[in-house]
Amino acid sequence: MKDLVKFLKAQSKSNDDFDVIKIGLASPDKIRSWSFGEVKKPETINYRTFKPERDGLFCARIFGPVKDYECLCGKYKRLKHRGVICEKCGVEVTQTKVRRDRMGHIELACPVAHIWFLKSLPSRIGLILDMPLRDIERVLYFESYVVTEPGMTDLEKNQLLTEEQYLEAEERWGDEFDAKMGAEGIQVLLRDMDLEHQCEVMREELQETNSETKRKKITKRLKLLEAFQQSGNKPEWMVMTVLPVLPPDLRPLVPLDGGRFATSDLNDLYRRVINRNNRLKRLLGLVAPDIIVRNEKRMLQESVDALLDNGRRGRAITGSNKRPLKSLADMIKGKQGRFRQNLLGKRVDYSGRSVITVGPYLHLHQCGLPKKMALELFRPFIYSKLESRGIASTIKAAKKMVEREEPIVWDILAEVIREHPILLNRAPTLHRLGIQAFEPLLIEGKAIQLHPLVCAAFNADFDGDQMAVHVPLTLEAQLEARALMMSTNNVLSPASGDPIIVPSQDVVLGLYYMTRDKVNGKGEGMYFLDPREAEKAYRTGQVELHARVKVRITEYSKNEAGEFLAETNLVDTTIGRAILWMIAPKGMPFSVFNQTLGKKAISKLINESYRRLGLKESVVLADQIMYTGFAYAARSGVSVGIDDMVIPAQKNDIITAAEAEVAEIQEQFNSGLVTAGERYNKVIDIWAAANERVAKAMMENLSTEEMLNREGNPEKQASFNSIFMMADSGARGSAVQIRQLAGMRGLMARPDGSIIETPITANFREGLNVLQYFISTHGARKGLADTALKTANSGYLTRRLVDVAQDLVITEDDCGTHEGIVMTPLIEGGDVKEALRDRVLGRVVAEDVLKPGTEQILIPRNTLIDEKWCDVIDVESVDVIKVRSVVTCNTDFGVCAKCYGRDLARGHLINQGEAVGVIAAQSIGEPGTQLTMRTFHIGGAASAAAKESSIQVKNAGTIKLANAKFVTNKEGKIVLTSRNTELTVIDIFGRTKENYKVPYGAVLSKNDGAEVGVGEIVANWDPHTMPVISEVSGRIQFSDIVDGLTVARQTDDLTGLSSIVVQDVGERATAGKDLRPALRLVDAKGNDIFIPGTDVAAQYFLPGKAIVTLDDGAEIAVGEALARIPQESVGTKDITGGLPRVADLFEARKPKEAAILAEISGIVSFGKETKGKRRLVITPAEGEAFEEMIPKWRQLNVFEGEMVQRGDIISDGAETPHDILRLRGVHAVTDYIVNEVQEVYRLQGVKINDKHIEVIVRQMLRKAVITNAYDSEFLEGEQVEVARVKIANRKRAEEGKPLVEFERELLGITKASLATESFISAASFQETTRVLTEAAVAGKRDELRGLKENVIVGRLIPAGTGFAYHQARAKKRVVAEQPFEMPVSKNAFATEADIEAEFEFVADEATQNLAALLNATDEE
């Protein structure tokens, strides 16, 4: 019977159908129940017989037999004795693999505190006992006593006593009280805790206290105590009395040759613990002196600490070779730990790797696989085929045949491989296109052949790159490889929706060459019947490839019914273009081909083809384009020779002129007219300009040539210079590189980023001298160092992004929200950075879009905007659209398809189950290596020149001012008195064309609503000073302006004019500290004048450093400057660019000198100042005033008495995203992060869709802080998932209770990853110990919602094809949880068919077209 029970128990263990994983503290009884026996001896194995010692660390009796079905002494062997326990050696006869999961235990002679709960900050034991960590450690390591039971004495519970105090107390009170040392003391304290009572006490304290710090502390402790109460963990379990022993096969001892042993460090650590434990037992048995026992107990505590987490306290225990031993904690954390090494990344069988070479003759869906590799990889398939055909009688025979490589084997191999896709992967796999499926073609040789067009996706080249091959084994895997991962289904990039299968290099050059035209080419002006005739004429040498000719071209276009209509015209074109037209698919217009095709044009062409004709046609077209491009690149004979680098004749004159200018500046510097900084900046400007001029002359010379046309007149045409053609077509090289070859190399930077003022005047054709070469090496070396750093940093950013977004999946079709974000074209100054159509393409409209100026609905709500709608938007000149966004999506755990919009890689509305989080992370992380690492230092003069002082309009239109307050001066011009005014120019359709920020004090020549022409200057201001503008006219009266006290007089030596400068408070004498200098405006009678429309007297307080040039009593008109405040041009500002900037944004870091924003709307005034700060007070119309201390050195943008709105900038600087969220809301912070991240990528020319950044922002905004909890399960000030609060609120709304109030919180991506609901996911990311400790104490449950948790427990992920599986399981679970009495309907347990019907996955165009495509490509 017992065996049967055991057998059943073993069976039930393998059941992995669990839905949740819970982690908790193990009680001593639990540990004993896991154990199969106590480990009593530190011995491992007998070194002569190599058999494990009895009761030792490898004991066979406890952990199971060493050999399968054989006891240790050899009495029972074979399967027939299964389950017998040998009476001689006590070993159960069973499989040896039980040694991997049977645990043992050690009974500790005294309790030992678990180091994780002691030292992992915040210390859980310290928090629960409310004692400082230092005190607890002193108790644990036997330095002082702790009072556990004060009795009737005047000692406190938890009080520490030194040795002397203890003896004194003992003399005084005898055994009235109880005090203990070591872990026993702590254990007693923990055991005596009354959690419920404590919780009540804390809640009362929480109500009474007012101090913020105290509240925080109490909340923390309260949460911990409640967690203990709810989870069923007992606090005393944080102190261990029994230690579990890991199964021996997980800490192996392997004999090496030469009689030595390799062992896991854990064995050493366990041996230490057992030795000390046994010694302590002996000492206790002998009743040894206290001091000796104490020392032994301390050593036991230390050795258990080392076993659990070596090095966390004190020095790490080292092994024989001086390196610290690897403890249990080290086994699971870090890159080499269990999580990241074995659970998230495994090695795979049926795989191989080899070098890649070009396969220019392959189809897009094929790759060349060396026969040798194929034979290895497809072995099992070959065996089964050989056997089923009866060619080999047994598997063994088949194996022999394959090893001998008999001819029949190769035939079988070819059969097996046919239409069996394989996966190719190139490391680093930065995005999902780094693994794609191909059909293998068997080839001779040892290198894998790769189709050239997929190189861009893999980022591969053929300079020795290697790729790995994997074989999908099961039918499902093959199906997924074929339908989802085939290279023909990955034409579009998931990051931007543009084609990624785009020709580059040779192909581009070939197409460019064949579509160029030439003046007076051979055969110009001939007429051809059709492209075939033209090709014949070219092949027979009658015409040149570039000759301009007329050809009859037949174009096909689709009508409404989808039939093709033919239309034939005689078209002006060239022979090359006519030949290229022969490969064009039906339905493409000839105009796309009838132009000189550069790289951009070809990309457009493929995109156009995809949108018009679908996937299959585009793939065939791409292949054809590639073959043609290669062929004509070979014919062109384009090569690089030294004579192609033509140096412009004007070069010497330009350089001589520049040298003369530099000499002149040097003269001025020597005579002291300019400063060193100015001289340096001017010299650099001169050389930069000279470089530009040389480059311009060179390009003019290179890019055009003059030919005689048929009439004999000169005509200009684009040059046929090889180097120019390569750069112009986009095949290789750029204008910058040509400039270095044939112009001049120009200015070089030092490693720190500053520019060396002597440029390299030579170019590579002339050659560099030693000094020039030396200067060049600076930049080159810095570039290499940069690249190395960049790769690591970019990889780490991607890892953090993936971790924060990994559990975001499309879980439903429509969440029904009306929320969204408002999209307008991105306009900066006079340039449209991104048009509206590009921003809304592939999004779903959140509210009906009306036709501008009418009530007519143009685009109804919930429409997916595609290219056709975009054209409508352009035609109707729509300017603003509210689209749905991931950030505003209402789905609880996941996102809905409508809020996400189009699946960029497929071109239709996204499917359910798509893992959008991971796609977003990959799309942002993948271009990371292209971003720069540098911080730009901009010198003083360089940035001074960049300061604008006027606005010149580029488009005609109407002016519109936003948040503007102004006065009109006596010339009738407008003077602004508001801070963040925006000036926009609007065209006749009402579309915004330009957008400018105008500062305070700017003089505008046009008012709101005025018309402006092209090139008009509408605003002027002085960039170096900020004026104080008078809003009324009157007479000036000085107030508190006292010479020598608050102001100082200055007289200009040249002009003799005197001015008053207000002194900073810090510089004034004591008497002037409280005076507040101001200018008041009075009328002739001396009465105060009020600012129009208010009851505020017109008086202007002057800040420090303000300069007043007017005298007391002077007359002043409206809009004139009363005083000027010099703006310190801040010296060198570091602009963080590139990768670090992106990381800062996603980590939501506060910038060094953040902008200060107004917390509330109201009137500004200044309170009493302290030593280094001034007090800013904002008084609202009603309610409390808000005070803030601001450092003196910050320049403020507001004057006393000014009205500010909540969220206005009070002091300039970089804005903190946290402030934006708090003061302006979720939309504003989304906008801010999206635009700032895009700014960095745009500079590098990388295109990423906004959606991806929004997905990450959604994950950063996952948490909320409860502001008013009412009677809910939340605590005030607690941080919880927004989804949890929403769910709770829905429930409360139904019950009619008040809703829980909360504020959204922005977390950086690292923080957000660690704060996920899933502890498994967080633990495998970073800070494993801390995460697991926290989770165990709280008894957390992991619902296994995200992708990562499911990968770790070894399941299908709840995304993609695994989505349906998880949905079906959830359904089954719901059915299973229904009460049993009711009759179970026949389809309560859904059949496979039901499930499939439930999730009728919309088969992609890709899947449908696949069979057709494969047949088509074979026939051609």
Curated annotation (Swiss-Prot):
Chain positions recorded as Zn(2+) 2 binding sites: 815, 889, 896, 899
Annotated catalysed reactions: RNA(n) + a ribonucleoside 5'-triphosphate = RNA(n+1) + diphosphate
Cofactor dependence: Mg(2+); Zn(2+)
Residues that hold Zn(2+) 1 according to the record: 71, 73, 86, 89
Protein purpose: DNA-dependent RNA polymerase catalyzes the transcription of DNA into RNA using the four ribonucleoside triphosphates as substrates.
Family note: Belongs to the RNA polymerase beta' chain family.
Entry protein name: DNA-directed RNA polymerase subunit beta'
Source organism per UniProt: Haemophilus ducreyi (strain 35000HP / ATCC 700724)
Gene designation: rpoC
